[in-house]
């Protein structure tokens, strides 16, 4: 039986993506040997470490857990959902190191909408982004993805720029308009 490792970071407030992941685990277990490596953005043990992990987009604790799971479970494929922020983008280096195939399920357009520093680049000449709801009147110049925080928005932009490179340089199947 094929082995699938499902990889996900839960949001602070449970929503549609977390519920979809739970349902997919149940469905996949009917046909595959499935194990899940689930992180939670509610579990922050050291805020200073998390800030460093944010800035370098690599969480050594999450990487170690994934490394152990890859060595013990030996999956045929890793099925990736949300990596923001606890899991981090460091997982892709590990998957490459282990020569492990992976599939990414994109539940939203955060990686696309959040990768620009300036709102003009995000909106691409439009007054409204149909993917995320951002409107040109939301901010003056900066692409403030999180309306309540410039800092969180900046951290997201750093993350999304790297995530977009990963998507661009991987064999990722996308549906385009």
Regions flagged by a language model, labelled:
Residues 1-42, 71-73, 91-101, 168-171:
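N-terminal subdomain of nucleotide-sugar transferases
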Residues 79-100, 104-137:
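An aromatic- and histidine-rich active-site surface loop
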């Amino acid at each position: 039986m094929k082995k699938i490792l499902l990889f996900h970071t839960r949001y602070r407030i449970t929503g549609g993506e977390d519920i979809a992941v739970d349902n997919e685990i149940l469905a996949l277990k009917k046909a595959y040997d499935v194990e899940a490596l689930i992180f939670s953005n509610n579990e922050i043990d050291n805020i200073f470490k998390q800030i460093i992990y944010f800035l370098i987009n690599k969480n050594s604790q999450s990487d170690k857990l994934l490394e152990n799971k890859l060595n013990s479970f030996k999956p045929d494929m890793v099925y990736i959902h949300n990596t923001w922020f606890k899991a981090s983008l460091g997982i892709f280096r590990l998957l490459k190191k282990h020569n492990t195939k992976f599939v990414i399920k994109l539940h939203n357009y955060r990686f696309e909408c959040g990768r620009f520093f300036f709102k003009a680049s995000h909106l691409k000449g439009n007054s409204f982004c149909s993917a995320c709801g951002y409107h040109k009147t939301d901010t003056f110049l900066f692409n403030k993805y999180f309306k309540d925080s410039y800092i969180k928005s900046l951290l997201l932009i750093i993350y999304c720029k790297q995530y977009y490179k990963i998507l661009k340089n991987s064999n990722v199947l996308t549906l385009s308009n």
